[in-house]
Amino acid sequence: MDFKLLQEKIVKNAEGYGKHYGIKIDEDFALLKLYEEVGEFAQAILIHRNKCRPEKRLSEAESKNELAKELADVVGMALVNAHLLDIDLEAAFEEKWFKNKQG
């Protein structure tokens, strides 16, 4: 999927969420939501590694699926933050990760 199209779809979804629940999707909300999602991803890692209470344990397949969903939430909220801050992430990736890099 095209990166910009993905970002547009995620932002539209976030805006729909805000409208449905009467929440203003602004920079404050997006940053705090990103923190929340990172925490949920960390919890999913603990569960995946069985470093949790026994009643929270899942099968390998279930925990891997939860990891993927929580990481998708982290990336999604990062994209919402980029949109709200008017940051071109494609250009930022190019400059930060790929420009003048060897190997």
Which role fits each region the language model picked out?
Residues 1-71, 75-103:
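Flexible "arm" and connector segments at domain edges
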